[in-house]
């Protein structure tokens, strides 16, 4: 047994010495390299779209997404943008109030819509901001309604501003309404008419020159962000009523056309202006293993415009069909602004998928907060005269030669 132990110790010492000798070779290599077939070799390379003269292309597009269920509603005008909002209140009357309305024994003393301002975009030093409120008598679905719906003519919207005056104290915004209009809403409810108020449309007047955001019914807000407050007198008593929101949304009209300028890449929230970007990576070998892949976008700070609060980051999504701009929504990467001023995000998964499946259809880039404001992110485009600031895809990869 002692001899067996002695032989085991000798063999172990021999293996340790051999291992130490091999690791102290004059030509150390990457892990596992010396185990490869001598005819094989691993190559580590970098692809850089701005240095490798790779073909790149981009175009902007607007996808008409619905804008219901957002944390803000937007109203106002600035430049080529006009924002309008639709609100539907839950308005009910007690049996006593219905009888009073039917007997012409109810008076609306005052009525107002209370809003909570949380955002501004445009010429915010101006005091030119006024709301118009118009009645809607056609039901609208906040999860299907778009700017095209508003312009379609299918919705009965009375073209009369029912605002008596607007009161703006920055912390709260009030639109005082014509009492006779609110009384008419009550009459339709009391008569159980098939024609009832379905909501109100909030529009800017002609002199408004900036856009404001108000906390919506979906906002994480203390209290009720939007309230219809009505004071009535009936049966010799006065009552203060509050009606809350059933649905709200905003729509934004952009009057200018998209300028297909390859020197600039423009993204804009509110109107859901996104960008399709393509990089030709055919020079990367088909058997490449992606170690890291980064996308960088360089902002044009003079052309970009931002509101008083916004999310300073972008979404990048994998395109499966470049004709219809269909995406794989399972994975989304984020570009964040670095201390160097450019936006950067890692795209290892996307690039490896391109290589493995020969499926490079491009990327869809959008603003992370697409409906909380109307921020305009302008980046240097794929044909910018400043070559170093063009959209940049960097791929560090390894392949067997």
Indicate where each model-derived feature is located.
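Secreted, disulfide-rich extracellular signaling modules
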Residues: 2-15, 19-401
């Amino acid at each position: 047994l002692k001899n067996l132990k002695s032989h085991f110790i000798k063999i172990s010492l021999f293996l340790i010495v051999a291992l130490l000798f091999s690791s102290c070779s004059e030509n150390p290599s990457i892990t596992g390299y010396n185990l490869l077939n001598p005819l094989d070799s691993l190559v580590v390379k970098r692809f850089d779209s701005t240095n490798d003269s790779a073909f790149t292309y981009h175009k902007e597009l607007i996808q008409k997404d619905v804008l219901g269920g957002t944390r803000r509603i937007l109203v106002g005008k600035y430049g080529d943008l006009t924002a309008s909002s639709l609100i539907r209140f839950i308005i009910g009357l007690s049996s006593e109030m219905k009888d009073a309305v039917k007997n012409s024994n109810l008076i609306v003393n005052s009525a107002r819509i209370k809003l909570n301002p949380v955002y501004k975009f445009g010429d915010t030093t101006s005091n030119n901001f006024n709301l118009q409120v118009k009645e809607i008598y056609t039901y609208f679905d906040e999860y299907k309604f778009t700017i095209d719906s508003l312009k379609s003519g299918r919705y009965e919207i009375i073209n009369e501003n029912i605002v008596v005056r607007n009161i703006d104290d920055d912390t709260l915004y009030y639109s005082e309404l014509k009492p006779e209009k609110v009384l008419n809403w009550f009459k339709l409810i009391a008569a159980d008419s098939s024609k009832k108020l379905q909501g109100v449309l909030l529009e800017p007047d002609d002199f408004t020159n900036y856009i404001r955001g108000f906390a919506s019914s979906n906002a994480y807000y203390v209290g009720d962000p939007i309230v219809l407050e009505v004071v009535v007198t009936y049966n010799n008593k006065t009552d203060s009523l509050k009606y809350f929101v059933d649905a709200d949304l905003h729509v934004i009209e952009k009057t200018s056309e998209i300028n297909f300028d390859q020197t600039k890449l423009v993204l804009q929230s509110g109107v859901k202006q996104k960008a399709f970007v393509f990089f030709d990576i055919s020079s990367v070998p088909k058997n490449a293993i992606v170690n890291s892949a980064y996308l960088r976008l360089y902002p044009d700070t003079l052309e970009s415009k931002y509101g008083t609060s916004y999310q300073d980051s972008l979404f990048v999504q994998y395109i499966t069909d470049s004709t219809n701009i269909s995406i794989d929504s399972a994975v989304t990467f984020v570009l964040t602004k670095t201390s160097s001023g450019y936006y950067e995000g890692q795209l290892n998964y996307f690039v490896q998928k391109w290589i493995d499946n020969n499926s490079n259809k491009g990327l869809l880039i959008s603003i992370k907060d697409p409906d909380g404001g109307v921020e305009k992110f302008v980046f240097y485009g794929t044909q910018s005269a400043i070559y170093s600031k063009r959209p940049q895809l960097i791929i560090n990869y390894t392949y067997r030669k």
